[in-house]
Amino acid sequence: MSEKDRIDLHGRSQGDFHIPVELIHSWKDLNEPFGIKDSYSRFIYANPAYLELLNLPKDFDIVGRLDSELPTPIAEFAEQFQYHERKVEMERQRISSLEIHRFSGNEFRAYFFDRYPYINQDGHIIGTIFHGRVAEFIPLSCYVQSGFNDPQPILFKKPSDIFTDAEWSVVFFALQNFSQKEIATSLGLKQKTINNRLDSIYKKARVSGLCQLINYIMENKLANYIPERLLRSGHYIMNIGQNKK
């Protein structure tokens, strides 16, 4: 492939870094985020969809910048991203993460991000490729320890008014097999308050205990709701579907 068929970004990052123009053409019009970083986690390329996800202008010059240098809420997770990228380079395998952030607004959004080693013509790893996609479905086992592993769509908005907001928070922890004491500690409440809320929840669901409540939640497809008050922005490395050496 001749030099005219490549995009040369030498000088914007450590060493020579060439991106085949075919990759740029393949990614630029896609509605899913794609990009490349060098081995120092500096951006070499990011497609318009990634800039849009971060609410950055289309002409924003991202090349040569670190995540920590971007004017976005995810900047505070730069060190975690770098750890992820070094792990990809070391293991020479795809490693995925679940990203839950207020990417560009007030509402939480969830994305899966896959990171792959970027290998040059000499077989050396010189960075990472990333690809993001909306996390419409995740295995409940990622956050619910109930034994139900069927993928369900994530919901950040209350799926039903059968329970109050306070009761939904209790349901969330109950699905993870938290004891009443553990739920009370997590929510900063007295155990008696949790007991009263569970009684109210059981009554509304017309069940007599936790096992029946779990079945009720699963049968009505309510287990995919994560109360926003319990959410924190985060970068969670996953092992679902990854290759193992």
Language-model-derived ranges and their functions:
Residues 32, 37-143:
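Sensory/regulatory domains in signal-transduction proteins
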Residues 172, 185, 215:
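A cross-family signal for key residues in well-ordered alpha-helices
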Residues 174-178, 217:
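Short helix-to-turn junction characteristic of helix-turn-helix DNA-binding domains
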Residues 171-172, 202:
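Hydrophobic residues on short alpha-helical segments
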Residues 202-245:
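Basic, Lys/Arg-enriched C-terminal extension of HTH/homeodomain DNA-binding domains
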